[in-house]
Swiss-Prot record:
Keywords: Acyltransferase, Lipid A biosynthesis, Lipid biosynthesis, Lipid metabolism, Repeat, Transferase. NCBIfam families: lipid_A_lpxD, PRK00892.1. This is UDP-3-O-(3-hydroxymyristoyl)glucosamine N-acyltransferase. One of its GO terms (cellular component) is membrane. GO terms for biological process: lipid A biosynthetic process. The active site is at residue 239. The keyword DNA repair does not apply. Pathway: Glycolipid biosynthesis; lipid IV(A) biosynthesis; lipid IV(A) from (3R)-3-hydroxytetradecanoyl-[acyl-carrier-protein] and UDP-N-acetyl-alpha-D-glucosamine: step 3/6. It is an enzyme of class 2 (transferase). Catalyzes the N-acylation of UDP-3-O-(hydroxytetradecanoyl)glucosamine using 3-hydroxytetradecanoyl-ACP as the acyl donor. Is involved in the biosynthesis of lipid A, a phosphorylated glycolipid that anchors the lipopolysaccharide to the outer membrane of the cell. Disulfide bonds: none annotated. Homotrimer. The keyword Lipid metabolism applies.
Length: 340
């Protein structure tokens, strides 16, 4: 969409219009950079003072923030959610042609649905099934007998190994690898013996996976990613991991094998989670969390020492290193006091 009247935008967003509905909106921008012709949003009332200097032609905000802005506005309950919907309307992501690119190799027995696009130099192996409106970007590899559901898009250079199942309306960013061997080895008197990984990866519907993330195939049981899961860039998801519906995983997270994560969880960036255990539904792990034990109660969990000036951090680290000795001394003092 190149432009839209503010009144028409309000109707599409189910927003209450205040001001001139004939204003033409040509784009969306942050409050600090928005100019005439653009629309912005205020999702945090702490930044209301910025409204007085805002140059946008219109602002999306809540009813209690409306008195702080004199220009045209769209009043909604959740400005951030409305921003997401506006961004979808104004998305400038290029739409690929519905054709087969130069140098693409497609096995004769692969099944392609209607309006499928396969980019240049992509490889589609034997037995693959691609649903309607699937987009396979340039340089992608889709291994034997893999199934990809309708409306799913793989950006350039995604690798999907054999016997993988990806649901409908998924989005997988460039460089991601799905279905590589999990880290499975047996030790024979100092020599590592590889264990073939016989499981698969099963990905549900409406899953989004960021760039350069790796999801390993199961050793025996399948690695499973539930419906509506969102996974950021550069995450490592080991074999046999199960992630429940609508869980969010931020960048750089490492999940060890045979971990089960429940539904509606949020895992902060750079967290490390031990394997062979479970995390229940509705758990939030804050950034750089180190999860070594199962979590059985919903809630917010944190670990680690927040950033401090180096001198203060060194003192804190020294205290942590000596906490066992201090505990022993405290118990000895308590025993003496109890005798008295």
């Amino acid at each position: 969409m190149s432009s839209i009247r503010l009144a028409d935008l309000a109707q599409q967003l189910d927003a209450q219009l205040h001001g001139d509905g004939d204003i033409v909106i040509t784009g969306i921008a942050s409050m600090g950079s928005a100019q005439a012709g653009q629309i912005t949003f205020l999702s945090d009332s702490r930044f209301r003072e910025k409204l007085s200097s805002c140059q946008a032609s219109a602002v999306v905000l809540t009813a209690d923030s409306l008195p702080f802005f004199t220009g045209a506005a769209l009043v909604v309950r959740n400005p951030y959610l409305t921003y997401a919907r506006m961004a979808q309307l104004m998305d400038i992501t290029p739409k690929p042609a519905e054709d087969i690119g130069a140098g693409a190799v497609i096995a004769p027995d692969a099944t392609l649905g209607q309006r499928v696009a396969v980019g240049a130099n992509a490889v589609i192996e034997s037995g693959v099934v691609l649903g309607d409106d699937v987009i396979i970007g340039p340089g992608c590899f889709v291994g034997k007998n893999t199934r990809i559901g309708a409306g799913t898009r793989l950006w350039a250079n995604v690798t999907v190994y054999h016997d993988i199942s990806i649901g409908e309306r998924c989005l997988i960013q460039s460089g991601t690898v799905i279905g590589a061997d999990g880290f499975g080895y047996a030790n024979d008197r100092g020599n590592w013996i590889k264990i073939p990984q016989l499981g698969r990866v099963i990905i549900g519907d409406r899953v989004e996976i960021g760039a350069c993330t790796t999801i390993d195939r199961g050793a025996l049981d399948d690695t499973r990613i539930g419906n509506g899961v969102i996974i950021d860039n550069q995450c490592q998801i080991a074999h046999n991991v199960v992630i429940g519906d609508n869980t969010a995983v931020a960048g750089g997270v490492i999940m060890a094998g045979s971990l089960t994560i429940g539904r509606y969880c949020m895992i902060g960036g750079a967290s490390v989670i031990n394997g062979h255990m479970a995390i229940c539904d509705k758990v939030t792990v804050t950034g750089m969390g180190m999860v070594m034990r199962p979590i059985t109660e919903p809630g917010v969990y944190s670990s680690g020492i927040p950033l401090q000036p180096n001198k203060e951090w060194r003192k804190t680290a020294a205290l942590v290193m000596n906490i066992s000795d201090m505990s022993k001394r405290m118990k000895a003092i308590e025993r003496k006091l109890a005798k008295n």
